[in-house]
A protein has these predicted regions:
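Phosphate-binding P-loop
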Residues: 1-5
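Walker A/P-loop phosphate-binding motif and the immediately C-terminal alpha-helix
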Residues: 6-44
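N-terminal phosphate/diphosphate-binding loop that engages ATP/GTP or pyrophosphate donors
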Residues: 31-93
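Conserved catalytic-core segment of NTP-binding enzymes
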Residues: 112-211, 217
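C-terminal boundary of histidine-terminating zinc-finger modules
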Residues: 221-232
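C-terminal alpha-helix
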Residues: 237-252
Length: 257
C-alpha cells in the first residue's frame, strides 16, 4: 500500500539559515535512500534552488497568472492547461524534484486557481516519501491551503533571546492554522560552542546544528550549501535530524495502518 508522504515545513525569520537547513535535510534524506524527495520553495525571498544547485525558470505563482491572462491552446480547458504547466514547472534533479511556489497573490478570482494548484500538489505528492517545504515565517501558502497541513513544523531559530520571540510568534501562527503542538519542533542553528541556548520552557530542541565554517565557505564561494562535505558538523547534525524524522514518520505510518 502506498504510504502517505510525510511533509516537513521549515519556518523561521530571515537570516536564521532555514534554507540551509532545508537543503541539508533534503540531502540527508537522499543519503538515507529516501528518494526522490520533493523540495518545495514556498518563500519568495528564499533561494532553495540555489542551495540545491538547480535552476528554476518559473514559479507556480507566475503559472497561475498565465492561466488567466494568456490564451489557452486549442483543445485544452484551464484545468488541463494548469495541470500541463504544473508538470513543466517541476525541476527534476538527482534524488529530488523541486517546485517553486512564487509569491502568493490575492484571493477572490484566484480561488479557482488556488484550488487547482492544491489538487495538482495532492496528485504530485503520491510519488514521494518525504516532502520538505522551505516556507515563510507567516506560512502564507500553508494558511491558504495550497500546501495542506504539514506533518511536522520545524522552527529554525538563533539560540538567543530574539529567537525565543520568533519561536513564540510562529508557534502562535501554526496553532491558529490548526497544527497540533506535538507536530511543532525547534531547531537551533549556528550554535556556537560554549554558549547557552535560550530557555524554551519544557520544549527540547529536536536538533542543535553547530556553527559550521563549511556553510559560510559555500556561501562566500557561491556554491550549493547542500554539497558541503558529508563530515562537516552541520551536515552530520542534520543527518541525525533526518534519522529522527524518519523514525517519527514510521511511527505515524504504524498508527494509520
Amino acid at each position: 500500500m502506498q504510504k502517505h508522504p510525510f511533509t516537513i515545513a521549515i519556518s523561521g525569520k530571515g537570516g536564521t539559515g532555514k534554507t540551509t537547513v532545508s537543503s541539508l535535510l533534503i540531502r540527508s534524506f537522499i543519503d538515507l535512500g529516501e528518494i526522490p524527495v520533493l523540495a518545495v520553495d514556498a518563500d519568495p525571498n528564499a533561494n532553495l534552488h540555489e542551495a540545491m544547485g538547480v535552476t528554476v525558470h518559473e514559479t507556480l505563482g507566475s503559472m497561475r497568472e498565465e492561466a488567466f491572462t494568456r490564451h489557452i491552446p486549442p483543445g485544452m480547458n484551464r484545468h488541463d492547461y494548469v495541470r500541463f504547466r504544473f508538470r513543466q514547472a517541476l525541476v527534476e534533479a538527482n534524488g529530488f524534484d523541486l517546485v517553486a511556489m512564487g509569491r502568493p497573490e490575492g484571493s477572490g478570482c484566484y480561488c479557482f486557481a488556488n484550488d487547482l494548484l492544491s489538487e495538482c500538489m495532492l496528485q504530485l505528492e503520491r510519488d514521494y516519501r518525504f516532502i520538505v517545504i522551505d516556507t515563510e515565517a507567516g506560512m502564507e501558502h500553508i494558511s491558504r491551503g495550497t500546501l495542506g497541513k504539514p506533518d511536522m513544523l520545524l522552527i529554525v531559530s538563533d539560540p538567543g533571546a530574539r529567537g525565543l520571540r520568533t519561536i513564540t510568534r510562529i508557534r502562535e501562527i501554526a496553532t491558529q492554522l490548526g497544527l497540533e503542538p506535538e507536530r511543532i519542533h525547534i531547531v537551533f542553528n549556528r550554535f556556537k560552542s560554549g554558549t547557552a541556548p535560550v530557555d524554551i520552557g519544557n520544549d527540547t530542541p529536536i536538533a542543535i546544528i553547530p556553527d559550521d565554517p563549511q556553510v559560510e565557505a559555500a556561501d562566500l564561494a557561491d556554491t550549493p550549501v547542500s554539497q558541503i562535505p558529508a563530515d562537516s558538523p552541520a551536515r552530520v547534525a542534520v543527518l541525525d535530524l533526518a534519522h529522527k524524522i524518519r523514525h517519527i514518520a514510521s511511527e505515524r505510518d504504524k498508527k494509520t495502518v
